Amino acid sequence: MRLSEYKRSNSAQNFDEFFRKGYVSILYGDSGVGKTTISLYLCLLAGAGKNLFHNLLKVKEPKKVAYISLELYKEDILEKLEPIRKRYRISTSEMEIMDLDDISDYRSFEKILEQKRYDFVVVDSFVAFYEGKSIYDPVEVKEFIKKTRKLARNSESHIMFIHHTIKSSGKNKTDRYQGVSTIKFLTTPFMQAYTEGKSFRVLTIEKHNFAYPFEKIYYYINKNGAITWYINEKAKYEEILHKFEPILKHLKDREYGMKTDELLNLSGLKKRTFYAHLNKLEEMGIIEWHHKGSKVSRVSISKRFKFILKRNNKFKRE
């Protein structure tokens, strides 16, 4: 999907706006990228009233949060939280931890939210509470999301599910999700449910190479509002520009773009690398394809990215 907006880590948002009450979101990514760690980080710091992601999200006051795990026991979660507690010297947090001893199914989950009020609820994992016969059935997926959105609205909470693709670590309590791939999960039913629904958000985590305190977090927001977090120390804005500079430097002043063959010759890149870069640039919303029939005839920098370049004074005329 084309991303129409790029945001840097210093573009702070209010936690209440980012995780709106009455919304349902799902956090997915490849196994081992840090979904559980990031979710625990969100809960602990939001519950302590601390700003998140190196001030990416502003927390005005402590949030009432709940972390519900059907994959790990409480003692395992507390162990994972310890490095974050020590790093930020957190002694108290409005964070409640629950596992299978507290919640066993969706109905018990509903009862908990009916009895208590939480600003933010994380459920690990999506499949553990899913009531349909198949997560590949778009009708069943949409019905489940619709039902959960209603619960989120009634309880005035933001409910975020973690979706594990293929589990690589942790003490499993269920193997219902084993072998489910991100690609298969997202290709039809889930994305259909997302694009056709309201009050629903998709959050993804890409390749990681991170360490506390998560200072190197960047994110994109696509035209539908889906968010992708890039938790990669090397994925800095300037480095992204530098990586694609051979292409961008030839496009920056050309209002109508350039022919692909001409651009390939000027870029100094191998053909395979050149087209791989173009695909990535298009995916990120940095460039736009221009077609002549079924063939791509030329490429230009997107209007949105031109604005970003101008705002950040990048690639000025020499």
Swiss-Prot record:
Q: Which Gene3D superfamilies match?
A: P-loop containing nucleotide triphosphate hydrolases
Q: Which UniProt keywords apply?
A: Plasmid
Would you tell me the protein name for this molecule?
Uncharacterized protein aq_aa20
Source species = Aquifex aeolicus (strain VF5)
